[in-house]
Regions:
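Short segments within alpha-helical structural elements
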Residues: 115, 249-274, 416, 425-485
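Sec/SRP-type N-terminal targeting helices
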Residues: 97-101, 114-115, 146, 160-188, ...
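Bacterial Sec-pathway N-terminal export signals of envelope proteins
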Residues: 21-126, 132, 159, 276, ...
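Periplasmic alpha-helical coiled-coil/stalk elements that build and connect Gram-negative outer-membrane
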Residues: 186-302, 412, 416, 457-459, ...
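Acidic, low-complexity, intrinsically disordered peripheral segments
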Residues: 2-13, 19-46, 131, 443, ...
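Small/polar, glycine/serine/threonine/aspartate-rich low-complexity segments that form flexible
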Residues: 68-78, 111, 124-158, 282-293, ...
Length: 491
């Protein structure tokens, strides 16, 4: 009897060892004759053991994958705050130079119009050898006789008055120059806004990259644990498939995050005026985020007073008014003084008489009175008046659009600020849901589907929370731009 019992114990021990050796092999297939209840129903609740050191993680390498995309960079790593980025862009961005040069060019137009205030002095050298008896028979009404001569002299003309036309043309050019200068200021504000958006987008991609890396790490751990449980016949192939699918999804998220970070840094480098991507160490501001103002009406009034686009369009409207007056003044006479002086060192005699003296000079005045030119001047004046009215309507439309943009930006800023707190609650609740789902799954009270759903929500919450802070800073920058505020800490 004792011998039979001892033999039975030895057989059981040998069978257990063989079964354990077979189950420890990572390539051992699932027995096909295993019942469905055994495959779907987990055994008694127990704590999942850690993955053995000898067991390689599942999906550690995926065939056909490559290293993350990395754009080539030039230069050394430099720390960069948003204020430093704005200063670099204002210094290096070619759009700043373009509008600054256009403003300088507009100032030269003013000098061109002012030239009418000054005398027009020019010199002439003339030498004539006509055919004998030649007369100018065709062309203008002038003296047809052509004398043989060689002479040189100076001619001077000076505008006395054109009854305001020149003054209005000079004022028109000066107002255009002021409008060009305001356009240069508006361009600088737009570049600063683009810098802020690119800077905070780059910071957001860095935060999302960290979220993606943490997600991959967490799901890798879950995949390893479930794979180990499956190898020990404690979980089914379905559990392993769900875990590995979640891991692959996290890796896709990581690839997108890596690509987006490189693209964001490339865009930031381009806005800062670099031809190639630069390596930046972006530094966040330590200032606490402040909520937007409570009243939007004050912001609208501030925008209508400060926006350089409104100032530029106002100058354009005023310039159109002055130009209309200048076109109207074409109907008035113009008075100018004339003077000539010169010397004739050589001239031929005609019938024994010298037709020229050795020196000559004269002064006089000329009055030009427009009488009729086919209604050209009235049409030009009417055209200028209509264009001035169009500029006035454009100014009114611009003010309406800016007021609407301020209201929309204010609403976006409030929404973005409120999203920070809501996404924090979202993160807290999803973290709790993942902990509870993990516990229920470990105890065998739920399926892998519940745990996978909780992990997906946790990842979504982490992404939303990482983006909420930077999206508010972008919305804050847009609001500052809309009201033309130079405060870096908020409106």
């Amino acid at each position: 009897m004792r011998r039979s019992i001892l033999w039975l114990v030895v057989c059981l021990m040998l069978g257990s060892c063989a079964l354990a050796a077979q189950s420890s092999s990572p390539t051992s297939p699932v027995p096909e004759q295993q019942s469905a209840a055994t495959q779907r129903t987990p055994p008694a609740p127990q704590t999942p053991p850690p993955a053995p050191a000898s067991s390689p993680p599942q999906l550690q390498t995926i065939p056909g994958t490559q290293a993350p995309a990395q754009l080539p960079t030039t230069g050394t790593l430099q720390r960069l705050t948003v204020q430093d980025a704005e200063a670099l862009a204002l210094k290096n961005n070619p759009q700043i130079s373009v509008y600054r040069l256009l403003a300088l060019a507009s100032q030269q137009v003013t000098r061109q119009q002012k030239a009418a205030y000054y005398p027009d002095l020019y010199g002439s050298l003339t030498a004539v050898k006509p055919e004998e008896g030649s007369r100018i028979a065709a062309g203008n009404l002038n003296n047809p006789i052509v004398y043989e001569r060689a002479a040189g002299g100076l001619a001077l003309s000076q505008l006395i008055t054109d009854f305001g036309r020149t003054n209005n043309l000079v004022a028109t050019a000066a107002l255009h120059a002021k409008a060009a200068n305001m356009n240069s200021v508006a361009t600088a504000d737009q570049i600063k806004l683009a810098v802020d958006q690119a800077f905070y987008n780059a910071l957001q991609t860095v935060a999302l990259l960290k979220v993606a890396e943490q997600t991959v790490s967490a799901r890798q751990l879950v995949s390893d644990q479930i794979t180990t449980l499956f190898q020990n016949k404690l979980r089914s192939q379905l559990d392993v498939s769900f875990a590995n699918a979640n891991l692959a999804q996290a890796r896709l998220l990581l690839l997108d995050a890596q690509s987006n970070q490189q693209a964001a840094l490339s865009l930031l480098s381009e806005i800062l005026g670099y031809a190639s991507q630069q390596p930046f160490d972006l530094v966040e501001s330590a200032e606490e985020l402040k909520p937007p103002p409570d009243s939007v009406s004050r912001l609208v009034d501030e925008a209508l007073s400060n926006r350089p686009e409104i100032a530029a369009q106002t100058y354009e409207y005023q310039a159109a008014q002055r130009f209309q007056k200048a076109e109207r003044d074409l109907l008035f006479p113009s008075v100018e003084a004339l003077g000539v002086v010169g010397r004739t060192p050589y001239s031929n005699t005609v019938a024994g008489v010298t037709p020229f003296t050795s020196w000559y000079g004269a002064v006089g005045a000329n009055v030009n009175i427009p009488i009729f030119n086919g209604f050209l001047y009235p049409a030009r004046s009417r055209e200028a008046a209509l264009r001035a009215q169009a500029d006035e309507e454009q100014l009114r439309d611009l003010k309406d659009r800016i007021a609407n943009d301020v209201r929309a930006s204010w609403l976006n800023a409030i929404t973005a600020f409120n999203r920070i707190g809501v996404t924090q609650q979202f993160v807290d609740q999803t973290n709790l849901a993942v902990d509870l789902s993990q516990t229920r799954y470990s105890l065998g009270l739920s399926s892998i589907v519940e745990l996978s759903q909780a992990q997906l929500q946790q990842t979504e919450a982490a992404i939303q929370f990482a983006a909420a802070k930077y999206q508010y800073q972008i919305a804050e920058s847009v609001l500052r731009f809309q009201i033309a505020s130079s405060s870096p800490s908020g409106p």
